[in-house]
Amino acid sequence: MKKVTKSTAKHSVNRRRFIKGAAAGAAGAAMLVGDQAVTAQTQSGNPDQSANISSEDGGANGNEGVGRSPKVDSFIVENPGSDYMVDVFRALDLEYCASNCGSSFDGLQESIVNHGNNQMPEFLTCLHEESSVAMAHGYAKIAGKPMMALFHGTVGLQHATMAIYNAYVDRVPVYMAVGLDYDGPVSAHNATDLAAIVRNFVKWDHQPNSLTDFGRAAMRAYTLATTPPMAPVLLVLDAAQQKAPLETAPSIPRLSLPKFPSADINSVKEIARLLVDADNPRINTGQAARTQEGIDLLVELAELLQLPVDGVNNRLNFPSRHPLQGTGTGVPDLILNLEPGARIGTTPSTPR
């Protein structure tokens, strides 16, 4: 990768200025072509056609602005609010944003590409919203941190629902955002309470009413998503906030990383005593061994006490080829469930 020095950056082409200049140049070229066409028609000896063009243009003396197209107001925002949003996402260490493009977040997409140079996050174009969430789902399980998925209005969020539910059931943090554009081209793609579509299977949702509120909400969403039990979160982003010019950007709030819950020392000592005194103990992992360190410690405990460990199929909590993997033999007289939902294969009448 080419290293960008100060001198290189100084002479680099700013993407937004280039696009702005190209648009202005294209408009000027179009006006020039129009003038040349009118001149050619006038020289060809067709005064009637020339007079019609002059009158349609509405010039005060019939000759001013002959042949020029009506002026179209350009919409250019130098510092949109979406630039601040990208800076916040970068502070959250969101590497990728998977999305099926939509008009309700074109401001944010433009800022990702031009303000953020398509890095942190990098915009990944997907053919379907369900694919976007599925990519973020798998990324979180491998990388150990959330990835962003971005949707367009009601239609995009509805397309994503099955994949969101899968992540919710699997307890995987997916950082999601959906665009809401009340003045957009299709009003049917909006809703008064857009997040209601998925509220029953996301951990938290919020629609910021200002950029300052967005900064706080973005940080809180990340903290809640990564706090066990982990789950997807959703932010509803108003298109007007994305595109509104910003004179002074709010400060980016600090991220408060969650601390994983753990048992107190007295409870740990009691569990150790019960395991040592038991004749045929067993451990049910559930989804508790979340990291490689957790797996290594669980293997060390199992080998120390020579007890079987019953993992689950949807997540690696214990090596599948380890001799102690499984339910063991006979009926256990003690079962240690590492989380409440880990009582697999047990009934109220089975041992404690």
Feature-to-residue mapping (PLM):
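N-terminal alpha/beta PP-like core and its mobile active-site loop of ThDP/TPP-dependent enzymes
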Residues: 2-11, 20-34, 39-352
